[in-house]
Amino acid sequence: MELLTNGVGLSVVVFFPLISAFIITLIPKAQEQLIKGFALVSSLITFVLSAVLLFQFDFSSADKLQLGNKISWIKSINANYEIGIDGISLPLLVLSTFITVLAIIYSIEHLPEPKSPKGFLASLLVLETGMNGTFVALDLILFFVFFEIVLLPMYFMIGIWGDKTVRTVSGFKNQIETRLYASIKFFVFTLFGSAFKASSIACCIKKEFCIDLIN
């Protein structure tokens, strides 16, 4: 269990779903049961590892960051790969991994059209990496990267597997599927939000402000 106390375990919880998603892309599309089973097992492993962190965490010092790690990343702007958890982020991390397990269990038998478990489950696991990363990131640029990772699979999941109901939307000449409209709206709003975040980070770097979230 020593690996879980020096930041390695936390990194595994974050990146294991991403590695699993990559492996899923290598599995032939026709082997749906293998894809579903592999995705479920991967999510369960991630959940178990996050649950183990509950026993490694010192709740008497819940206000302090623990089980983290810091590695120099982009030296020119003093950005680091810095992660850690406290009494607030740990429950959210465990909840994130648990909900992912439930989502995969449900989607195995209720996968929306078009039924492509390979793409859907791989996207869901990439989404999990982004979610887990946002809860543990202690560097502003690292947080931004993980936040953007969340947005990419969400956009495709909404646009491909969303509601196919056709509706009339002001501004569109013809009727449009709800999922297409929702994905466009999602893209526009997140694009503006990401632009503002990126601009704010750039200003912090230019003014030589600290981009370490704990300082």
Locate each region found by the language model.
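Hydrophobic residues within membrane-embedded alpha-helical segments of Major Facilitator Superfamily
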Residues: 16, 20-23, 42-46, 92, ...
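Hydrophobic transmembrane alpha-helices of multi-pass small-molecule transporters
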Residues: 21, 47-50, 104, 152-156
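N-terminal signal-anchor/start-transfer transmembrane helix
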Residues: 12-32
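Membrane-embedded alpha-helical segments in integral membrane proteins
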Residues: 1-2, 20-24, 72-80, 127-141
